[in-house]
From Swiss-Prot:
Name of protein: TM2 domain-containing protein ZK858.5
Organism whose genome encodes this protein: Caenorhabditis elegans
Broad class of where this protein is predominantly found: membrane
Membrane topology: Multi-pass membrane protein
UniProt cross-references to InterPro entries, sorted A to Z: TM2
Superkingdom, natural source: Eukaryota
Pfam families: TM2
UniProt keywords, alphabetically: Membrane, Transmembrane, Transmembrane helix
Entry's Gene Ontology cellular component terms: membrane
Cysteines engaged in disulfide bonds, as pairs: none
Annotated transmembrane regions: 10-30, 37-57, 104-124, 127-147, 168-190, 209-229
Domain TM2, first and last residues per copy: 8-55
Localization terms from the record: Membrane
Keyword Membrane: yes
Length: 409
């Protein structure tokens, strides 16, 4: 071999683990590229994997050094009979429940991230659409394929893709399951089918594979962040004070001011004003439309006009869980202002959480006003008082009672 590999020092791996362990730098140094990407895309598997490797990294180093010291003939364990290799035995891989669990969870993770990007950024809410099913199935396939490459093994990409698409199609179009259940069950089926093609890996991945996978993942994250900025941060909040004036600000500006200048947020919600929500206007005049039509493709790309055109559907599409997230953020901020004013003594997070629960409990619009929600609570309380029966063990009723009493304080 022209490029002979040398043994690695444990202290070097420890330093790399401390500095860049959350992003999989130590795994990349040990040429465990798929494992490094999993660390990178999950921040060290939410710190748990990073903590585990901080204690067990010596075993990984010893295993790597043993592979380096092995002769060329012993790099792959092959079964021979009468001078011929038995291919079926050389490809045999033992079943591992741990790997199976990792594959299902990571495939579901990437699949959910793909679904989130399509929903938040591009406004795809109908999961029954074939293109939507294809994109989500592709995300699940990518996650299962990456896990299948870990530990010196590999999986056939075509097997995983066919199983993922067909399972997703059946779950969504025929079984009519929810998105989360469909993604999870599809990940299970795809992992089982993919394991049928499991074999020992015969080539090593390089940093180019890591760079390519990381670029795709970062692009996915950027798409999600851009969508969240349009659906959440760009949402306009109007505070109306009777007999005074109306003031409008975006949710993103409120979050920024809460971090850097909390007094602005408190002054905005001072006096418990009437809160209204509305989307940022995207209406353009005719001259703007003509400019968009006459401008070149690259000008539209660099100016952001093309992105606005592609994500226009998401900007107009109403998604309940995103609206609930927006109202929860605003509720926490205005509840903090009420505590500072002395008009409330309830913990802001608790008050906002109960308010969101009541919206979900009564199936109301996420952007409902406080007056309307108070009316619904009083109406529900009146109806419950007129009913006879033992409700001490009905947790739905008990939760609604607690939520209404907390909100009406």
């Amino acid at each position: 071999m022209n490029n002979e590999e040398t043994e690695v020092k444990p202290w070097i791996v420890r330093i790399i683990l401390i500095v860049g362990g959350l992003f999989g730098a130590h795994r990349l140094y040990l040429k465990q590229v798929p494992e490094a990407f999993v660390f990178f895309s999950t921040l060290g598997v939410l710190l748990i994997g990073w903590l585990y490797d901080s204690f067990m990294f010596k075993y990984e180093v010893n295993e790597y050094n043993q592979l380096i010291n092995q002769s060329e003939n012993n790099k792959e364990k092959e079964k021979w009979k009468n001078g011929k290799m038995q291919a079926s035995q050389s490809k045999f891989v033992d079943f591992s429940f741990t790997r199976f669990l990792y594959s299902v969870l990571y495939g579901s993770y990437i699949g959910l991230a793909t679904w989130l990007a399509c929903t938040v950024t591009f406004g795809w809410t109908d999961i029954n659409l074939i293109p939507f099913i294809c994109v989500v199935a592709l995300g699940i396939t990518a996650g299962i394929y990456i896990i299948g490459q870990c530990g010196g093994q590999s999986r056939e990409l075509s097997y995983i893709w066919m199983a993922s698409f067909s399972s997703m199609f059946i779950m969504v179009r025929l079984a009519q399951t929810t998105v989360f259940r469909a993604i999870f069950l599809t990940a299970i089926v795809s992992t089982v089918i993919g394991n049928r093609s499991a074999r020992l890996k015969k080539r090593r991945h390089t940093w180019k594979h890591f760079l390519f996978w990381s670029s795709l993942f970062l692009m996915l994250v950027c798409v999600i962040l851009l969508g969240c900025s349009r659906k959440v941060a760009d949402k306009q909040v109007t505070a109306t004070r009777p007999g005074t004036f109306r003031e409008t600000i975006s949710v993103g500006s409120l979050i920024r001011d809460r971090i850097f200048d909390a007094k602005k947020v408190h002054s905005f919600f001072e006096g418990n004003p009437i809160i209204e929500y509305h989307s940022k206007s995207d209406i353009k005049n005719k001259n703007g439309e003509k400019t968009l039509k006459n401008s070149s493709f690259w000008y539209q790309v660099w100016s952001g006009e093309l992105f606005d055109e592609l994500t226009g559907a998401a900007h107009l599409t109403k998604i309940d869980w995103i609206e609930l997230t927006t109202t929860f953020i605003v509720d926490v901020l205005r509840s903090e202002a009420r505590v500072i004013d002395g008009s409330s003594t309830i913990e802001p997070f608790k008050w906002a959480l109960w308010r969101n629960y009541l919206i979900h409990r009564f199936s109301l619009d996420p952007l409902i006003s406080d007056d309307r929600l108070r009316t619904e609570c009083k109406k529900w309380q009146t109806e419950e008082k007129s009913k006879k029966g033992n409700v001490d063990r009905d947790y739905n009723i008990l939760a609604a009672k607690q939520g209404c009493s907390t909100f009406l304080l």
